[in-house]
């Protein structure tokens, strides 16, 4: 089973959600620190890097399952990311598509943008401050407005 799972992950394409690259470039130009906080392990992330060598360059930090004691939906992973940047929860924004990730961001008391990429708007709305289909239309300015800044 493990070999089949490894082969499946090796063959995954890890396609970006529409608008991702433009969005992350936009917020980084504004000086926003960025992190990936994933329940995936280092080996799975190596598959992502193999398919998208530029991926690491989009982020200041990449935290994998090896970096935290409790997995999502515990807030631990997001709180550790905030701590690495010297930030408080109210200074952070979580972008998530999974139920456990959304719950984790909520439990960390961060602003949560839910992506309706694998689940419906209605399903993730209770766990999100706002729901979007993809990164198209998301911007630094729009998020700052949502935060009241």
Predicted regions and their residues:
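Short, basic/glycine-rich phosphate-binding loops at helix/coil junctions
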Residues: 1-6, 59-62
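Asp-based, Mg2+/Mn2+-dependent phosphohydrolase catalytic module
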Residues: 25, 41-43, 47-149
């Amino acid at each position: 089973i493990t070999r089949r799972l490894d082969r499946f992950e090796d063959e995954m394409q890890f396609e970006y959600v529409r608008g991702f690259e433009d969005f992350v470039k936009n917020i980084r130009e504004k000086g926003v620190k960025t992190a990936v906080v994933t329940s995936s392990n280092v080996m799975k992330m190596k598959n992502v890097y193999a398919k998208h060598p530029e991926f690491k360059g989009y982020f200041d930090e990449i935290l994998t399952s090896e970096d935290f004691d409790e997995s999502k939906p515990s807030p631990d992973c997001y709180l550790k990311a905030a701590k690495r940047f010297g930030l408080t929860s109210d200074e952070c924004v979580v972008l998530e598509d999974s139920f456990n990730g959304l719950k984790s961001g909520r439990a960390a008391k961060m602003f949560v943008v839910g992506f309706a990429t694998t689940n419906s708007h209605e399903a993730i709305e209770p766990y999100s401050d706002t729901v979007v289909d993809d990164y198209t239309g998301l911007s630094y300015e729009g998020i700052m407005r949502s935060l009241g800044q």
